[in-house]
Curated annotation (Swiss-Prot):
GO terms for molecular function: rRNA binding; tRNA binding. It comes from the Bacteria. Binds 23S rRNA and is also seen to make contacts with the A and possibly P site tRNAs. Keywords: Ribonucleoprotein, Ribosomal protein, RNA-binding, rRNA-binding, tRNA-binding. Belongs to the universal ribosomal protein uL16 family. The keyword Ion transport does not apply. One of its GO terms (cellular component) is ribonucleoprotein complex. Part of the 50S ribosomal subunit. The keyword RNA-binding applies. This is Large ribosomal subunit protein uL16.
Length: 10
């Protein structure tokens, strides 16, 4: 999935 700039993931 496409991850946003700032989330729980790095």
């Amino acid at each position: 999935m496409l991850m946003p700039k700032r989330t729980k993931y790095r």
